[in-house]
Amino acid sequence: MNLKHLFIVATLALGAASAFAATPSAKAACLTECTPRVGIVSAFGQEADILVAQTQAPHAWVINGNRFTTGTLRGVPVVIVLSGVSMINSTMVTQLMVDHFKVQRLVMSGIAGGVNPAHHVGDVIIPDRWAMPLEVFWNRDSTLPATCGKAADVSCLGLKLASADGKPVPPFSLATPAGSVPTGLFMRENFVMTAANAPGGEFRFDYPVDAEMLAVARAIKPVLARCGPKATKTPGAQPDPSLCVKTTPQVIVGGRGVSGTAFLANPQYRTYLFEQLQAQTFEMETAALAHVAYANHIPYIAFRSLSDLAGAEEFNADAVALFASGLAETNEAAVTLAFLDGWRHRK
């Protein structure tokens, strides 16, 4: 065989190897450690610290600057990481965890703003589905976009408006002293690609929480404190009432959670989310994790402790107490630990 033939054979072999490496079946898994684990992604550093402190046989892995801690927590093999605030951070850290560890289930926890006015500061909300209402089509006014030839059709742009009962969700309008101001913000479904729906992919608005994990969450009975550990200055003393929330926090399961790239402090938009979506809570990470979980076929659940009623000043004193006393991270960790206990002993 001459050099020309050797070159051709080598080129064909290299091309075949490259093609094989690009196929979905050749995707590498658990690049760092391959013990089956529950992945815990915390958006709140203090809570992650509590969980890591209680983890048995902890081992820290630093991947792309992110510290992942493996070990056993309440008898369950886990890997714990802090995502930090934002949809993008949540997406990147969750996918990094999925790539480098053998994650069989995902748990997200952290702080959130309340949307349902019936809830109180300190309540821990466990929604049964999550959505991203700030994925929008921003029209010039509140007229239904007809970009692709008919009302509400934006398919030629690779987009789809979110709808309820077959009708697009009405756009948000801002009330002002001069009257209602249309924003032209129409909610969209977002596009997700998985091994199961490739190559066409699909549009989704809601990402349902895993039914088995939700059943365990409904059964747990964690004791949630009204005063955080820092509310008591000296051992045996009464807690400082200014560092306690007024209403004993409860665990509330069900309803829709929503996430977005904005920090929500607008009471009008909060009301809009509650009226149009019956949203229970708003934050900046979970729906992104849910998208990653769905794309990777990994069941997930999320726990969120309410820091306030988003944009409502009347809850400011309780919000201060929640953070200053350490109550936020204490109650969040209590729910996560109770869930792991329940998960370990599930039938």
What are these regions (language model features)?
Residues 9-18:
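Bacterial N-terminal signal peptides
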Residues 1-8:
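Bacterial N-terminal signal peptides that target proteins for export
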Residues 22-347:
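Accessory terminal and edge-of-domain segments that mediate assembly/interaction
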